[in-house]
């Protein structure tokens, strides 16, 4: 079943694969509480707190009694500081996203570091940070950021793609002299400006 496949992927830290499989499961059967609750846990582990809460709330609406989702919600809501921190993190990520879209990369990077300090599992923040470092020619930092994200979700397609691109740029840099290296980085910045950034609502 989709649920069992999703559970296996989650245990193997293929979180994006698990989320995709579990979404199919709840699409086929909206009342599949086990799949919906697990999907919420997967989202939460990826730093996607809004999506996690959404799944758990829907789950408790479908089955109010004897539902583990109620415990998840209560545990988080009882910690007022945690709720406030999570809400603040979302706002900070959206600010960082706006800075990135406007080309204010330094400010975006500062915001993303704050986001990851508060929510160290936020995959999208690592990905955007890596993209900005890549844009600035800071390949080692970009690679470090992506590798951190892949410790959380090792099969994330976007992370795999970014890591491949980073490695390609690093390999190319080794073949060029310092002057050409700087010119290449300037050209890279122009290419990255046109790249579509992640949306805070994408999963």
What are these regions (language model features)?
Residues 23-27, 58-61, 116-117, 150-151:
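Conserved structural position within tetratricopeptide repeats
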Residues 33-34, 67-68, 89, 123-124, ...:
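Helix-start (N-cap) detector for alpha-helical repeat units in TPR-like alpha-solenoids
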Residues 1, 77-91:
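TPR-adjacent "capping" and linker segments in tetratricopeptide-repeat scaffold/adaptor proteins
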